[in-house]
Regions:
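Flexible coil/turn and secondary-structure edge motifs
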Residues: 1-152
Length: 152
């Protein structure tokens, strides 16, 4: 599919080398993020943006479904002016599509230092599949995404 690596981590905060325990308190300024390494010959940055938009609620400020706190904000961290321009264009197109009743609040910023999350956070959905399945069902995410994107 073009994605070579997806690494869980933290970005955007003030604390160096944060731990999950620190970030989960919501006062470090960091967001929980995924760093994507991809092959642009197989999947484009714009295609990755499309996947991103279709898997979040971009109108939710400082929460995503059952997860509440600034560490759960939606934010696109870009590398270089080309990614910045493409991300802004993508967000603007989504905003202008009138897909959502509320404004899109997803921030787009230059990528600061990426801190890799602890090993137990990598591929959490695989390592804790039963726990993740219960969470995914109870969060309301699936229903929201199906309702929002069912016509596409």
């Amino acid at each position: 599919n073009g994605v070579l690596e997806a690494t869980s981590g933290y970005m955007g905060g003030e604390i160096e080398n944060p731990t999950y325990e620190q970030v989960s308190m919501g006062n470090t300024g960091h967001a929980e993020v995924v760093e994507i390494e991809y092959d642009p010959n197989i999947i484009t940055y714009n295609e990755l943006l499309e996947v991103f938009w279709r898997n979040i609620d971009p109108t939710a400020l400082n929460y995503q479904f059952a997860d509440v706190g600034s560490q759960y904000r939606t934010e696109i961290f870009t590398v270089g002016p080309k990614q910045m321009d493409e991300a802004i264009k993508s967000r603007d197109e989504l905003e202008n599509s009138n897909k959502f009743d509320k404004p899109i609040v997803t921030a787009i910023t230059e990528a600061p230092v990426f801190y890799i999350a602890e090993e137990y956070h990598q591929d959490f959905y695989k390592k804790q599949s039963a726990r993740y399945k219960i969470y995914a069902e109870a969060s309301g995410r699936k229903g929201f995404l199906e309702k929002t994107w069912s016509e596409d």
